[in-house]
Amino acid sequence: MSNTLPRFIAAVNTKGGVGKTTTTIGTALALVKLGYAVEVRDVDPQGSATSWAMQARQAGTPLPFDVRVANRMTVGEPPADPDTWVLIDTPPSQSDLIGAAVDASSLVILVSTPGRLDLERMAQTRSNIGRASSVLLTQTKQGTVSLRDAEAFLTEHRIGRFDTMIPFREGIRRATGTATMPSATGYGSVTYEILQAWGLR
């Protein structure tokens, strides 16, 4: 990828509960920690990212970036500063919203747990997008059959993934609605891989 590409990234899977919002917020926090400007756009009618931001603000520790509600018409609007990273949280359904988010993005993060149903839904989603994409495995447990099967599934279907995998951690669940993500979540490493893809590391 080129460092001249718009810095738009969408977290996508038509299966719910795989960690799209956590990935969006976790990556945004990691980018801010490295000194980058970030904006999150929430196109999910359930408003999970928006709710996260509201909870953090009510707790007195607001997120260090804006979370904007967006729709299919506004999700691709360029930020005021072209160096701003725009991370898009998408719904598990509403194909028009997912399509608009994908169309606006230079990179699609296909978020999936190692579960077979989640992987199959991810692969189906991948076949319908026309953007550079990479799978991010979440809620993983090292040494398990499910993780080995997931890696074999991706290899068999020739689907690329992030080297980093997000572990199943109680700390990640507890981070919901806060402005702090535990250091060992893996999102810092995911962010480093993203920056490498843009030629910024």
Q: Model segments located where?
A:
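Conserved C-terminal guanine-recognition region of P-loop GTPase G domains, centered on the G4
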Residues: 119-138
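Inter-motif core of Ras-like GTPase G domains
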Residues: 93-116
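P-loop/Walker-type NTP enzyme "switch/lid" segment
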Residues: 2-18, 25-99, 127, 167, ...
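Short, well-ordered alpha-helix to beta-strand connector turns
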Residues: 83, 104-106, 158
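Short, conserved loop/helix-junction motifs that constitute active-site signature segments
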Residues: 103-104, 126-131, 154-156
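Beta-strand-loop-alpha "switch" segments that mediate conformational coupling across diverse proteins
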Residues: 141, 151-183, 193-198
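Conserved nucleotide-binding/hydrolysis micro-motifs of P-loop NTPases
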Residues: 45-47, 116, 140-143, 170-171
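Short, well-ordered beta-strand core segments
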Residues: 86, 108-109, 133-135
